[in-house]
Amino acid sequence: MILNKTTNERFDVKITKADTFFKRLIGLMGRKDIDFAMLFTNIKNHSIHTHFMRFDIDVYFLDKNNKVIEKTTLKPWKFYRPSKKAEYILETKKDKLKIKIGDCLEFI
């Protein structure tokens, strides 16, 4: 579950952590659809891509306090480099969550 502490809104979505090199490498590639959000931790390279993906995603870049510092929507086969360094990256299916830049999140 995700709690948007800024708006007090709760999103009933399962969080899958990509906290190892292999999980970060595979990410959402090859999936036909998802019903969860993927949280990337231990980030070394802030660039992301949507190669081998079959659907659009919303990507949220979070600082060390889980505050959204940047957001983008990507179609399959795209590459993106954020303008700010993030501590965490949250990926979800496009339009699944109503989260804006500046919102603070808590993962429950």
Language-model-derived ranges and their functions:
Residues 1-108:
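Compact, glycine-rich, soluble single-domain proteins
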